[in-house]
Amino acid sequence: MKRMLISFCLAAASAAIAGGSANYPVNAMNRMLEVECAKRGITIIDYHVHIRGGMTPELAAEREKAWIVRSSAMDNHGREWDTKNDSQLLRFAEKAKAVSDRMPVGIQVNDRDWFRQISPSTREKLDFILADTMIMGKRADGRDNRLWQPQTIDDPEKWMKEYFAHNMRILDEPISILANPTYLPMELADRYDSLWTDERMRKLIEKAVKKGVALEIQAGSPYPRPRFLLMAKQMGAKFSFGTNNFDSKPKDLARWLEVITWLDLQASDIWTPACLKK
């Protein structure tokens, strides 16, 4: 019944979001999310708020004043991104923290040697570090191979072995959140069940739990699929929430509501950064 009601609310939510405000609209679906979170004692923090496309720390701070979903401010770090070094990262963190001392500030790391590029003292200034698995290897021109762009994959199983090892290496990095877990490029999306076997899922979840890395539930993403989510909860994983915005427009949060209710998530299932435990 709840799933049917959530589906019924989607059209209204999409229409309200199209209005252009940076704040989340007051609609039936968002009211349901608010009720479910209150009932379960869950505080939702969006840890995947990119400062780009018109989104600013100021808008993020204003957004969280308007509704129950709290915001963060996150910069991208890497050789092919604007923020490449400690001084640039510190400037970003200081500016964001000056806007709101209650808003977690972090980065998305895109180079796999990022922890050698960023000094430990700079890392200590951050509240969280997020990574995804969607950049793997280099293209022929030497630039990062971004898996959301068209790929040529001749041998899916061979590619998957390499990609799974890539996932496990990222979990060995000192990160806080693994974003969009079990992602696959569009060329392999229809092979999800055969490529993401139970064994691979179990090993990934085991390492995430061991390392204390949260698994993201991303608004608008089909990943991870229900089989992974159920296994992750049963194995004691912690979850986080993210939107992965491209601009300042609020995203449809139906995915969050669906997973919270389907998995019967409680406050104890949700990851919290050290800065909010004080």
Predicted region positions:
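Domain-core and long-helix interface of multi-subunit machines
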Residues: 132-136, 143-235
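Hydrophobic h-region of N-terminal signal peptides that target proteins for export
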Residues: 9-18
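Short amphipathic alpha-helical segments and helix-helix/interface helices
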Residues: 59-62, 90-97, 119, 167-168, ...
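Charged catalytic cores and adjacent phosphate/nucleic-acid-binding surfaces used
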Residues: 21-42, 192-278
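Conserved, mostly hydrophobic/aromatic
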Residues: 48, 129, 180, 215, ...
